[in-house]
Amino acid sequence: MTIDLNCDLGESFGVWPMGSDAAMIELATSVNIACGFHAGDADTMRKTVDLAGTHGVNIGAHPGYRDLHGFGRRPIAGLTSGEIENLVAYQIGALQAIATMAGHRVTHVKAHGALSNVACEDDMTARAIASAVKAVDPGLVFVVPANSRLVAAGEAAGLPLAHEVFADRAYEDDGSLVSRRKPGAVLHNADEIARRVVTMLQSGEVVSITGKPIRMRMDTVCIHGDTPDAVRIARTLRQALKDNGIAVAPFNLIK
């Protein structure tokens, strides 16, 4: 068995640092880089692209709502389909330009935060994101939360998909993520997270916060780079995967 490990990086902004990108990028096989709307800036994007290129990991765009103050974790109501398409295409294009200048290429797109959460439940938003990805480059892999409406939107657009599960987030019984506003939504114990992910991969099931097993396709596992002890969590998980005979590789290299 082989799995991809993806991490959201490039979330620093100006003089304000966020995360431990240099350490995390050594443990991931794919990275999702903030494109300036919810976090990041041109210089941070370039630094993160260079790091990713040095370590041979997949480079992905991580578009979100234009909400620096809220880190893209607050829904923005009233956007039209066209407005969503434009904000997604804008951010993908920005990272593509930076990557091209650095001699690398963008391989995938993963929606960030509230944009992703809304799209998981709202067909219009999901279709708009998928439409933007296809319009920019139909060869981009669309990284989507497993069992969400983004899966159907990506399939309808004819995009290659990577189904994602989360190492450090709890799930509701319907397969959606537990809101960050609720207790227990974000997991922090590295050993428990590692055991959980190994069990998920071996069983093909995620266990919800109430104990309900949910079947999910799993192509990539996300570890959030802004989680406290993210580096320790990632290292513990990598070791647990190795101990259980589970290899890691970029999803585009997994047969």
From Swiss-Prot:
One of its GO terms (molecular function) is 5-oxoprolinase (ATP-hydrolyzing) activity. It catalyses: 5-oxo-L-proline + ATP + 2 H2O = L-glutamate + ADP + phosphate + H(+). One of its GO terms (biological process) is carbohydrate metabolic process. InterPro entries: Glyco_hydro/deAcase_b/a-brl, LamB/YcsF/PxpA-like. Pfam families: LamB_YcsF. Its EC number is 3.5.2.9. The keyword Protein biosynthesis does not apply. Keywords: ATP-binding, Hydrolase, Nucleotide-binding. It comes from the Bacteria. NCBIfam families: PRK05406.1-3, PRK05406.1-5. Forms a complex composed of PxpA, PxpB and PxpC. Catalyzes the cleavage of 5-oxoproline to form L-glutamate coupled to the hydrolysis of ATP to ADP and inorganic phosphate. Belongs to the LamB/PxpA family. This is 5-oxoprolinase subunit A. It comes from Nitrobacter winogradskyi (strain ATCC 25391 / DSM 10237 / CIP 104748 / NCIMB 11846 / Nb-255).
